[in-house]
């Protein structure tokens, strides 16, 4: 009887770690499929130019379009980072992009360049990541009004986001940013 127990332990000692390793690798591969790093050269380039964390940019793209360059929202925002025509025109003027057309928002490099610049602009304008992300989602005018209202902000920082959609958006982007940071820690 003792002999059988001895044989089972070494087999279990080998199989159990292999099973755990297999499950961990399978989970990692699934997460990498769910949270890809597409357009990495472009993202890294514009992250460096704007000083933004590339994981934040990947998280915004994932949240906005799930990396679908042909995405169009019900509000007519277009491309990877979901930029609408009016915002696109504003950004193109600031970036001195001659001959900008609304259809250019479907070009990944153009959309990432514009979206990254705009997010950086909003974060600088409002002085924080939460406020910048909220403005990216709900618009700068709304964030200004929230900051001015003691129920939602202290004049500088948002303490409460009154739009559930925007509150969830900020939370989702932050969660995805953490996922990207963990999955691609070597990057």
Specify the residue positions occupied by each region the protein language model found:
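Low-complexity, intrinsically disordered/propeptide-like segments
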Residues: 4, 15-19, 59
């Amino acid at each position: 009887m003792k002999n059988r127990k001895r044989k089972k332990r070494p087999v279990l000692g080998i199989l159990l770690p292999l099973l755990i390793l297999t499950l961990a690798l399978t989970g990692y591969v699934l997460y990498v499929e769910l949270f890809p790093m597409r357009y990495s050269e472009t993202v890294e380039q514009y992250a460096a130019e704007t000083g933004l964390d590339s994981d934040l940019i990947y998280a915004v793209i994932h949240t906005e379009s799930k990396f679908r360059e042909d995405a169009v929202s019900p509000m007519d925002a277009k491309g990877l980072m979901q930029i609408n025509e009016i915002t696109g025109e504003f950004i193109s003027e600031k970036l001195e992009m001659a001959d900008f057309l609304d259809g250019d928002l479907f070009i990944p490099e153009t959309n990432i360049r514009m979206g990254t610049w705009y997010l950086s602009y909003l974060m600088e304008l409002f002085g924080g990541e939460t406020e910048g992300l909220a403005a990216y989602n709900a618009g700068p005018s709304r964030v200004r009004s929230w900051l001015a209202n003691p129920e939602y902000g202290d004049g500088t920082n948002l303490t409460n986001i009154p739009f559930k959609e925007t509150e969830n958006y900020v939370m989702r982007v932050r969660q995805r940013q953490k996922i990207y940071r963990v999955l691609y820690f070597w990057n």
